[in-house]
């Protein structure tokens, strides 16, 4: 056992126990308090930010809708990276360039919520989100130049076409798809010249599609139809193109838009990617944004 390797993320302590039988839980929690490292400096676009810096700053790393089904609330989870947080303080939403008040910060323990009065680097706070936050957003008390690097996203490897047959449920369907995509649980794409009554969904694993279907049914009252598609790769076009229809692509390649209206090509295999690059001079593709 080497604590230095643990702090580097190269070694992970493992505890055996049972939460259901309350065996080993207390031992784990006490050890966790002893082993957990102090908050480390966080990389921003302008360099490392010291957790002891007086300026409060943090970033949104998770968004969760419908945590309380009775109120249809949406919570943005923020990790404090520096300074001291206080309930009711005003901070800059750096990406929007606006000042916002953090009026009802919450702390979560299982199903219990408590109002959080103060917080420090390393703490997690939950903020009510009326739709102004996105994953990766930076909050800063005084310094608008603090911009933390975004959360890395993984290129989807499983794709499905998702639609709802009941036209009366279309509004709930669109809301559910948009909110679940904002959480980062899935990536949604729109086929060109096709309306928003159906989406192409990209996921890293099959479980994400199952969770999507379950949450649409239970949280939004929608019975979706999910049909798997044969694609295995998504590639974003970074080179300038006027008309994607002018690209020379294999017959099995599909062109779609992502949620920010960027062109994305869906491929069935690596050969199709290589063929597109060889037959379209200047075409540049990346596997995630």
Ranges and model annotations:
Residues 1-289:
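Structural and coupling elements of P-loop NTPases
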């Amino acid at each position: 056992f080497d604590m230095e390797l643990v702090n580097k993320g190269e070694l992970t302590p493992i505890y055996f126990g049972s939460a259901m039988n309350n065996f080993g839980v207390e031992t784990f929690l006490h050890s966790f308090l002893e082993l957990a490292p102090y908050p480390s400096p966080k990389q921003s676009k302008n360099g490392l930010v010291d957790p002891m810096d007086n300026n409060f700053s943090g970033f949104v790393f998770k968004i969760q809708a419908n945590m309380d089904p009775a109120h249809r609330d949406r919570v943005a989870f923020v990790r404090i990276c520096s300074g001291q947080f206080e309930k009711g303080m005003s901070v800059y939403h750096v990406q929007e360039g606006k000042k916002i008040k953090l009026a009802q910060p919450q702390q979560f323990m299982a199903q219990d919520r408590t109002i959080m009065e103060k917080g420090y680097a390393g703490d997690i706070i939950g903020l009510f989100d009326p739709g102004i936050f996105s994953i990766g957003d930076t909050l800063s008390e005084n310094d608008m130049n603090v911009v933390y690097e975004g959360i890395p996203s993984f290129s989807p490897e499983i794709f499905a076409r998702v639609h709802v047959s009941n036209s009366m449920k279309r509004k709930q369907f669109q809301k559910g798809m948009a909110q679940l995509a904002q959480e980062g649980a899935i990536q949604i794409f729109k086929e060109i010249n096709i309306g928003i009554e159906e989406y192409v969904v990209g996921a890293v694993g099959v479980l994400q599609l199952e969770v999507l279907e379950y949450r649409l049914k239970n949280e939004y009252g929608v019975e979706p139809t999910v049909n798997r598609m044969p694609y295995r790769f998504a590639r974003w076009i970074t080179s300038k193109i006027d008309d994607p229809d002018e690209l020379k692509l294999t017959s099995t390649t599909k062109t779609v838009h992502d949620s920010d209206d960027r062109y994305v090509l869906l491929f069935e295999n690596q050969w199709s990617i290589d063929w597109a690059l060889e037959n379209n001079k200047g075409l540049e593709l990346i596997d995630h944004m």
